[in-house]
Amino acid sequence: MEYVAAYVMFDKVGKELNERSMTELFNEIGAEIEPETMRLFLSKVSGKSMDEVMSKGKELMASLAISSSQKSEPAQPADTAESTQATENKEEEDEDFDIFAAF
């Protein structure tokens, strides 16, 4: 979240956001940087306007809201192995979610 906040701050003041400027900002405020995460974030937003990033974020959030608001069907008696496999598949899908992939 701190990388997103830095992105917004740099955009609002019209400064270029890059690895050096973000590192300087984080050092100035005493925040820790995870270099790999920062580089991944910068690679995903590089060359994109704030409007593009916000629009893509809204689309992503809307799709999450739809999938989480869907009601599940009442439980039906089923083979235990099948229901266990379905639960494991759902958990794997949740683990694979990557917010940076949206950009």
UniProtKB/Swiss-Prot annotation:
- Annotated region (Disordered) at 64-103
Which GO BP terms, alphabetically? cytoplasmic translational elongation
Where is the protein found, in the record's own terms?
Cytoplasm
List the biased-composition ranges (Acidic residues).
Answer: 90-103
Highest taxon listed in the record's lineage: Eukaryota
**One Gene Ontology molecular-function label:** structural constituent of ribosome
Give the matching Gene3D superfamilies.
Answer: 1.10.10.1410
Per UniProt, which keywords does this protein have? Answer: Cytoplasm, Ribonucleoprotein, Ribosomal protein
Q: Could you confirm whether the keyword Phosphoprotein appears in this record? A: no
Pfam families noted in UniProt: Ribosomal_60s (PF00428)
CDD domains named in the record:
Ribosomal_P1_P2_L12p
Q: Extract the coiled-coil ranges from the record.
A: none
Transferase as a keyword?
no
List, alphabetically, the InterPro entries matched: P1/P2_N_sf (IPR038716), Ribosomal_P1/P2 (IPR027534), Ribosomal_P2 (IPR044076)
A cellular component term from Gene Ontology for this protein is: cytosolic large ribosomal subunit
Family designation: Belongs to the eukaryotic ribosomal protein P1/P2 family.
The annotated subunit structure for this chain is:
Component of the large ribosomal subunit.
Q: What does this protein do?
A: Plays an important role in the elongation step of protein synthesis.
Q: What is this protein called?
A: Large ribosomal subunit protein P2
The organism named in the record is: Encephalitozoon cuniculi (strain GB-M1)
